[in-house]
Protein backbone atom coordinates (compact mmCIF):
# COMPACT_ATOMS: atom_id res chain seq x y z
CA UNK A 1 0.00 0.00 0.00
CA UNK A 2 1.15 3.48 -0.76
CA UNK A 3 0.87 6.22 1.88
CA UNK A 4 -0.48 9.50 0.48
CA UNK A 5 -1.83 12.80 1.66
CA UNK A 6 -5.02 12.66 3.67
CA UNK A 7 -7.17 13.15 0.55
CA UNK A 8 -6.70 11.04 -2.57
CA UNK A 9 -8.60 12.06 -5.69
CA UNK A 10 -9.33 8.88 -7.65
CA UNK A 11 -10.21 9.20 -11.32
CA UNK A 12 -10.99 6.00 -13.23
CA UNK A 13 -10.75 6.69 -16.95
CA UNK A 14 -11.54 5.18 -20.31
CA UNK A 15 -10.87 7.39 -23.34
CA UNK A 16 -11.16 10.77 -21.62
CA UNK A 17 -8.42 12.69 -23.47
CA UNK A 18 -10.77 15.59 -24.24
CA UNK A 19 -11.56 16.33 -20.60
CA UNK A 20 -8.93 14.76 -18.32
CA UNK A 21 -6.56 17.73 -18.21
CA UNK A 22 -9.27 20.19 -17.13
CA UNK A 23 -10.54 17.71 -14.51
CA UNK A 24 -7.04 17.31 -13.04
CA UNK A 25 -6.37 21.06 -13.11
CA UNK A 26 -9.70 21.66 -11.37
CA UNK A 27 -8.71 19.40 -8.48
CA UNK A 28 -5.20 20.82 -8.30
CA UNK A 29 -6.88 24.17 -7.71
CA UNK A 30 -9.73 23.10 -5.40
CA UNK A 31 -7.79 20.52 -3.32
CA UNK A 32 -4.14 21.56 -3.66
CA UNK A 33 -2.93 19.27 -0.84
CA UNK A 34 -4.51 16.17 -2.36
CA UNK A 35 -2.80 13.51 -4.42
CA UNK A 36 -4.50 12.92 -7.77
CA UNK A 37 -4.54 9.42 -9.26
CA UNK A 38 -5.74 8.52 -12.73
CA UNK A 39 -6.28 4.83 -13.39
CA UNK A 40 -6.42 4.22 -17.11
CA UNK A 41 -8.73 1.32 -17.97
CA UNK A 42 -7.37 0.34 -21.42
CA UNK A 43 -7.92 3.66 -23.17
CA UNK A 44 -7.19 3.73 -26.89
CA UNK A 45 -6.52 7.48 -26.85
CA UNK A 46 -3.97 9.72 -25.07
CA UNK A 47 -5.76 9.82 -21.68
CA UNK A 48 -2.82 8.37 -19.71
CA UNK A 49 -0.21 10.53 -21.44
CA UNK A 50 -2.16 13.77 -20.96
CA UNK A 51 -3.00 12.94 -17.34
CA UNK A 52 0.69 12.41 -16.55
CA UNK A 53 1.63 15.67 -18.26
CA UNK A 54 -1.02 17.45 -16.17
CA UNK A 55 0.64 16.19 -12.99
CA UNK A 56 -1.48 13.21 -11.96
CA UNK A 57 -0.04 9.89 -10.85
CA UNK A 58 -1.12 7.55 -13.64
CA UNK A 59 -1.57 3.83 -13.30
CA UNK A 60 -2.90 1.20 -15.64
CA UNK A 61 -5.78 -1.16 -14.89
CA UNK A 62 -5.90 -3.87 -17.57
CA UNK A 63 -8.97 -5.63 -16.14
CA UNK A 64 -11.89 -3.98 -17.93
CA UNK A 65 -14.68 -2.37 -15.92
CA UNK A 66 -15.14 0.59 -13.61
CA UNK A 67 -15.87 -1.62 -10.59
CA UNK A 68 -12.59 -3.50 -11.11
CA UNK A 69 -10.75 -0.22 -11.44
CA UNK A 70 -12.26 1.18 -8.23
CA UNK A 71 -11.32 -1.95 -6.28
CA UNK A 72 -7.75 -1.68 -7.59
CA UNK A 73 -7.60 1.98 -6.58
CA UNK A 74 -8.78 1.25 -3.04
CA UNK A 75 -6.30 -1.63 -2.78
CA UNK A 76 -3.35 0.46 -4.03
CA UNK A 77 -3.92 3.82 -2.34
CA UNK A 78 -3.97 4.69 1.33
CA UNK A 79 -5.53 7.95 2.49
CA UNK A 80 -7.88 9.23 5.16
CA UNK A 81 -10.46 10.27 2.56
CA UNK A 82 -11.06 9.27 -1.04
CA UNK A 83 -12.74 11.52 -3.55
CA UNK A 84 -14.08 9.62 -6.56
CA UNK A 85 -14.85 11.45 -9.77
CA UNK A 86 -15.38 10.52 -13.38
CA UNK A 87 -12.82 11.84 -15.84
CA UNK A 88 -15.40 13.12 -18.31
CA UNK A 89 -15.75 16.63 -16.87
CA UNK A 90 -19.38 16.12 -15.79
CA UNK A 91 -18.76 17.34 -12.24
CA UNK A 92 -17.47 20.61 -10.79
CA UNK A 93 -14.10 20.17 -8.99
CA UNK A 94 -14.64 23.43 -7.07
CA UNK A 95 -17.37 21.68 -5.07
CA UNK A 96 -14.96 19.02 -3.73
CA UNK A 97 -14.05 20.94 -0.55
CA UNK A 98 -17.77 21.11 0.32
CA UNK A 99 -18.11 17.33 -0.01
CA UNK A 100 -15.05 16.75 2.19
CA UNK A 101 -16.29 19.30 4.75
CA UNK A 102 -19.70 17.63 4.98
CA UNK A 103 -18.07 14.21 5.42
CA UNK A 104 -15.90 15.46 8.28
CA UNK A 105 -18.41 17.73 10.04
CA UNK A 106 -21.25 15.23 10.01
CA UNK A 107 -18.94 12.29 10.76
CA UNK A 108 -20.48 10.16 8.03
CA UNK A 109 -18.96 7.51 5.77
CA UNK A 110 -19.92 8.84 2.33
CA UNK A 111 -21.20 11.98 0.63
CA UNK A 112 -22.62 11.74 -2.88
CA UNK A 113 -22.34 14.78 -5.14
CA UNK A 114 -24.64 15.47 -8.04
CA UNK A 115 -24.50 16.72 -11.57
CA UNK A 116 -25.74 20.30 -11.68
CA UNK A 117 -26.57 20.25 -15.34
CA UNK A 118 -27.76 16.83 -16.38
CA UNK A 119 -26.18 16.56 -19.81
CA UNK A 120 -28.01 13.34 -20.58
CA UNK A 121 -30.78 12.81 -23.03
CA UNK A 122 -34.33 12.89 -21.76
CA UNK A 123 -34.48 9.09 -21.25
CA UNK A 124 -31.46 9.20 -18.93
CA UNK A 125 -32.90 12.10 -16.93
CA UNK A 126 -36.26 10.37 -16.53
CA UNK A 127 -34.60 7.08 -15.58
CA UNK A 128 -32.41 8.81 -13.01
CA UNK A 129 -35.42 10.59 -11.50
CA UNK A 130 -37.33 7.29 -11.31
CA UNK A 131 -34.46 5.47 -9.57
CA UNK A 132 -33.92 8.37 -7.17
CA UNK A 133 -37.63 8.33 -6.27
CA UNK A 134 -37.59 4.55 -5.77
CA UNK A 135 -34.46 4.75 -3.61
CA UNK A 136 -36.03 7.47 -1.44
CA UNK A 137 -39.19 5.37 -1.01
CA UNK A 138 -37.28 2.20 -0.11
CA UNK A 139 -34.52 3.61 2.09
CA UNK A 140 -35.66 7.06 3.14
CA UNK A 141 -32.51 8.79 1.90
CA UNK A 142 -32.97 11.98 -0.07
CA UNK A 143 -30.76 11.36 -3.11
CA UNK A 144 -30.92 13.70 -6.06
CA UNK A 145 -28.46 11.74 -8.23
CA UNK A 146 -28.09 8.12 -7.08
CA UNK A 147 -25.89 7.26 -10.07
CA UNK A 148 -23.47 10.10 -9.46
CA UNK A 149 -19.81 9.33 -10.00
CA UNK A 150 -18.87 12.18 -7.63
CA UNK A 151 -18.40 10.77 -4.13
CA UNK A 152 -16.19 11.25 -1.16
CA UNK A 153 -15.73 8.39 1.28
CA UNK A 154 -13.96 7.88 4.54
CA UNK A 155 -11.21 5.26 4.24
CA UNK A 156 -12.51 1.89 5.30
CA UNK A 157 -10.31 -1.17 5.85
CA UNK A 158 -12.67 -3.44 3.95
CA UNK A 159 -13.05 -1.19 0.91
CA UNK A 160 -10.59 -3.06 -1.34
CA UNK A 161 -12.28 -6.39 -0.66
CA UNK A 162 -15.86 -5.18 -0.85
CA UNK A 163 -17.88 -7.10 -3.45
CA UNK A 164 -20.12 -4.05 -3.76
CA UNK A 165 -17.30 -2.27 -5.57
CA UNK A 166 -17.14 -4.93 -8.27
CA UNK A 167 -20.40 -3.63 -9.73
CA UNK A 168 -21.18 0.01 -10.36
CA UNK A 169 -24.18 1.35 -12.26
CA UNK A 170 -23.73 4.10 -14.79
Task: Kindly give the residue locations of the regions a language model identified.
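Short aromatic/hydrophobic "clamp" motif used to bind/position activated sugar donors
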Residues: 82
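Conserved donor nucleotide-binding strand/loop of the catalytic core
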Residues: 35-37, 48-76
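Conserved catalytic loops of nucleotide-sugar-dependent glycosyltransferases that act on lipid-linked
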Residues: 69-70, 74, 90, 120-170
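Short, well-formed alpha-helical segments that are part of the catalytic scaffolds
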Residues: 15-29
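Short beta-strand/loop segment that forms part of the nucleotide-sugar
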Residues: 11, 24, 33-42, 59
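Conserved donor NDP-sugar-binding/catalytic core segment of glycosyltransferases
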Residues: 97-122
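Acidic helix N-cap motif at the loop->helix transition within catalytic regions
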Residues: 18-22, 45-54
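A conserved acidic beta->alpha catalytic loop
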Residues: 40-48, 89
Amino acid sequence: MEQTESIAVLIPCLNEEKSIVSVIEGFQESLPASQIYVYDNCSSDRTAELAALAGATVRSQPKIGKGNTLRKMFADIEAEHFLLIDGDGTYVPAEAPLLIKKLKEENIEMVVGRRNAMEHDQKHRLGNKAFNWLYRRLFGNDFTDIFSGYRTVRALPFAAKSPALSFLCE
